[in-house]
């Protein structure tokens, strides 16, 4: 059960984190952790999410080496690729002509063919597309609060109802 997002807590001078802890304490599973330890676990979790030490399971070192080698080649040639341009394509026009409000001209014949000049080709069919927006549950990283951990958090200065 996710804590409700409410402006009422801010009006009462209560932080969202404290309101979430209170909500979980009242309506959630058996929470055996004081707010101080809850906040410390939350900040540790936040630091973990924001750290650059995250490694994905599908990380491929060969791909990273290939990408780094390409970026070094591009940097040494003095050419920068624009969006949608592959490494083998010549640069079309200078970047100094680009400014706010400048639109790219569509290639000749696109207007005649009835294609949208802002069309970006993909390899997905419409039925395969996934919306980019996050759901309500995932929209805020604070939804990963400490009670989402699989293990039950406890602290030494919170009254325990279970024999140790």
Swiss-Prot record:
Claim: Cytoplasm is one of the keywords in the record: yes
Task: Report the locations given in the UniProt record.
Answer: Cytoplasm
- Region (Interaction with LIRE1): which ranges? 1-68
| Stimuli inducing this protein | Down-regulated by gonadotropin suppression sufficient to cause marked suppression of spermatogenesis and additionally progestogen treatment.
Q: Which GO terms describe its molecular function?
A: piRNA binding
Q: Which UniProt keywords apply?
A: Cytoplasm, Differentiation, Meiosis, Spermatogenesis
Any keyword Cell membrane? no
Residue ranges under compositional bias (Low complexity)? 84-95
Can you cite a GO biological process for this protein?
A: transposable element silencing
Q: Where is this region: Important for interaction with piRNA?
A: 111-159
What does UniProt give as GO cellular component?
cytoplasm; nucleus
- Tissue distribution of the protein: Expressed in testis. Expressed in undifferentiated embryonic stem cells.
| Region (Disordered), start-end ranges | 56-112
Which PANTHER family does the entry link to? TESTIS-EXPRESSED PROTEIN 19
| Self-association state and partner proteins as the record states | Interacts with UBR2; does not lead to TEX19 degradation and stabilizes it. Interacts with piRNA-associated proteins DDX4, EDC4, MAEL, PIWIL1, PIWIL2, RANBP9 and TDRD6. Interacts with L1RE1.
The task this protein performs is described as:
Required during spermatogenesis and placenta development, participating in the repression of retrotransposable elements and prevent their mobilization. Collaborates with the Piwi-interacting RNA (piRNA) pathway, which mediates the repression of transposable elements during meiosis by forming complexes composed of piRNAs and Piwi proteins. Interacts with Piwi proteins and directly binds piRNAs, a class of 24 to 30 nucleotide RNAs that are generated by a Dicer-independent mechanism and are primarily derived from transposons and other repeated sequence elements.
User: Can you say what this protein is called?
Assistant: Testis-expressed protein 19
Q: Which organism is it from?
A: Homo sapiens
Q: Read off the lineage from the record.
A: Eukaryota, Metazoa, Chordata, Craniata, Vertebrata
Gene assigned in the entry: TEX19
